[in-house]
């Protein structure tokens, strides 16, 4: 006969965040001694940290606050919508918004509830039972627009874009948010074509030329064909040269110009993406 009650199991789960069977086993091994059961689960959690470190984190969320965008990753979508995980992300982004750290390492070193952010993450990892990774952070100073996209209604945002812009008024803010939505959808990498590195442009020209020659295009037509294909590349990766997802008859640049907006920079985070 078990020397613990269902109430003990419930209390232990609430205190440690461990699964039902883990709590039952801990209470059984501790012969009903609640404090010993807590200690055993804490020790097991510490031992599991090394194992968790080797696992991949392909789920998670992107969250934003006051000019900060950050990504917190986990292993499963079940944890991605876990209340403790959501609260952890909100706590971290609140700290980040106040301090505006330069990078992930700087954010991990900041204080949260009397501990470092990194320590809090590791403690939550042990409690939840999954590897948790604070993978990305960006912080902008000027007026910003944010767009967060959910892949599924029951999950938190998995794609986030933070745009810094110049412009005034509601129309400018709306246009900037439209630009953020554009980046989320079409994955632009640059604001203008001037930002595209010369070596990348040169490589695109080389590919366009070699492809055209392989297709047997006439020599005299090559310059125009190459230019057209390079311009096509710019439309793929340059925000201001794309057709707007909100109004396909206009370019993003035209919409921004109408609202008096200049995009200074942007970042796009996507859970599960390598960069």
Curated annotation (Swiss-Prot):
InterPro entries, sorted: EF-Ts_dimer_sf (IPR036402), Transl_elong_EFTs/EF1B (IPR001816), Transl_elong_EFTs/EF1B_dimer (IPR014039), Transl_elong_Ts_CS (IPR018101), UBA-like_sf (IPR009060)
Main location: cytoplasm
Role according to the record: Associates with the EF-Tu.GDP complex and induces the exchange of GDP to GTP. It remains bound to the aminoacyl-tRNA.EF-Tu.GTP complex up to the GTP hydrolysis stage on the ribosome.
Localisation: Cytoplasm
Keywords: Cytoplasm, Elongation factor, Protein biosynthesis
PROSITE patterns named among the record's database cross-references: EF_TS_1
Protein family (similarity comment): Belongs to the EF-Ts family.
Gene3D superfamilies reported in the protein's UniProt record: 1.10.286.20, DNA helicase RuvA subunit, C-terminal domain, Elongation factor Ts, dimerisation domain
Protein name: Elongation factor Ts
Cellular component GO terms, alphabetical: cytoplasm
HAMAP family: EF_Ts
Region (Involved in Mg(2+) ion dislocation from EF-Tu): 76-79
One function term, GO molecular function aspect: translation elongation factor activity
Short name of any one Pfam family annotated for the protein: EF_TS
């Amino acid at each position: 006969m078990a020397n613990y009650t269902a109430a003990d199991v419930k209390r232990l789960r609430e205190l440690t965040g461990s699964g039902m069977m883990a709590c039952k086993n801990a209470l059984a091994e501790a012969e009903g001694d609640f404090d010993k059961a807590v200690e055993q689960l804490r020790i097991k959690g510490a031992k599991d940290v090394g194992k968790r470190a080797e696992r991949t984190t392909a789920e998670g969320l992107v969250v934003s606050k006051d000019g900060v965008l950050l990504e917190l990753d986990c292993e499963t979508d079940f944890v991605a919508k876990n209340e403790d995980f959501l609260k952890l992300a909100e706590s971290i982004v609140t700290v980040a918004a106040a301090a505006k750290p330069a990078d992930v390492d700087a954010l991990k070193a900041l204080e949260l509830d009397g501990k470092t952010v990194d320590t809090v993450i590791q403690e939550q990892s042990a409690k939840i039972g999954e590897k948790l990774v604070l993978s990305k952070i960006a912080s902008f100073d000027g007026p910003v627009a944010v767009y967060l996209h959910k892949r599924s209604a029951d999950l938190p945002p998995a794609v986030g874009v933070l745009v810094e812009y110049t412009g005034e008024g509601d129309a400018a803010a709306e246009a900037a948010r439209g630009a953020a939505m554009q980046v989320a959808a079409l994955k632009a990498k640059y604001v203008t074509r001037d930002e595209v590195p010369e070596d990348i442009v040169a490589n695109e020209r080389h590919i366009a030329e070699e492809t055209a020659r392989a297709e047997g295009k006439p020599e005299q037509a090559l310059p125009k064909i190459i230019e057209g294909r390079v311009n096509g590349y710019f439309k793929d990766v340059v925000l201001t040269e794309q057709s707007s997802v909100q109004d396909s008859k206009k370019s993003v640049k035209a919409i921004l110009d109408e609202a008096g907006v200049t995009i200074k920079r942007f970042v796009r985070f996507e859970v599960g993406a390598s960069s």
